[in-house]
Regions:
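Short beta-strand->alpha-helix linker/helix-N-cap micro-motif
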Residues: 25-94, 109-116, 136-138, 177-181
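Catalytic-center loop of serine/cysteine hydrolases
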Residues: 78-80, 84-185
């Protein structure tokens, strides 16, 4: 994919959330970076490439719903990722994640990996300290009852909760955002991810088709409807 297409893909799929971190006064900025497919089987490769965008975008939506969190400027992250020549499904090591986090004024970066082995889904999220470059925590869906691809949204939600517990325990005491009380069928989430993928490639028509399919499965899907507004201007 050309670099300009990579930048567009990241601009529609990568978001920033913020939250207070233990031992730190006030809110801390957290940069959510691309996730890497570390070896998935059982579906078209296009779907796995799309999930590399859809998973961090969905994680960001989950984290941004908390009252103690704030959104930082998304464009700074896009520029930082582009300066590192990182695209969707890029492998982001701890040093690179820390460097990007510092560039965008974040205290922490969140990146990770996923793997789908014929329906058994594993999602790992890493918290990287911007100053030291160290991986502070790795969280995952290690509950054997929650490793089925059919429960992908709940898997992402579980990892988001674990990340939040590490970076912002106070946010968990602030109540449950409306977004966390919803459910997103895996088919809708997959179609949304494909919409992000095609939008990033500059194919607005195909992106619109996939966003339409996501909304057909789940009419109350704000992220997919926002995607439709972006690609169709309505």
């Amino acid at each position: 994919m050309p670099r300009w297409s990579i930048a567009r893909a990241l601009s529609v799929a990568v978001f920033i959330s913020a939250g207070p971190v233990a031992g730190q006064n006030g809110p801390a900025v957290i940069a959510i970076l691309p996730f890497e497919d570390r070896g998935s089987y059982g579906q078209d490769k296009e779907i796995f490439r799309a999930l590399a965008l859809g998973i961090p975008a969905t994680l960001a939506s989950e984290l941004s719903g908390h009252s103690n969190l704030r959104l930082a400027d998304r464009n700074r992250v896009v520029r930082a990722l582009r300066s590192e020549n990182l695209g969707p499904n890029a492998k982001v090591d701890a040093a690179t994640a820390a460097r990007i986090a510092k560039q965008v004024g974040a205290h922490y970066a969140i990146t990770g990996t996923f793997a789908d082995f014929y329906g058994t889904f594993r999602l790992d999220g890493r918290i990287v300290d911007a100053e030291s470059g160290q991986i502070l925590r790795v969280v995952t869906n290690n509950d054997p009852k929650l490793q089925d691809r059919a429960e992908l949204y709940r898997i992402i939600q579980m990892v988001a909760h674990k990340l939040l517990a590490e970076v912002s325990p106070a946010a968990l005491r602030g109540g449950t955002p409306q977004a966390e009380m919803r459910t997103i069928p895996t088919e809708a989430l997959t179609q949304y991810s494909l919409g992000l993928w095609y939008e990033g490639k500059g194919d607005r028509e195909k992106a619109g088709e996939h966003y339409d399919r996501a909304v057909a499965v789940l009419p109350d899907y704000p992220e997919a409807r926002e995607g439709l507004r972006r690609v169709r201007g309505s």
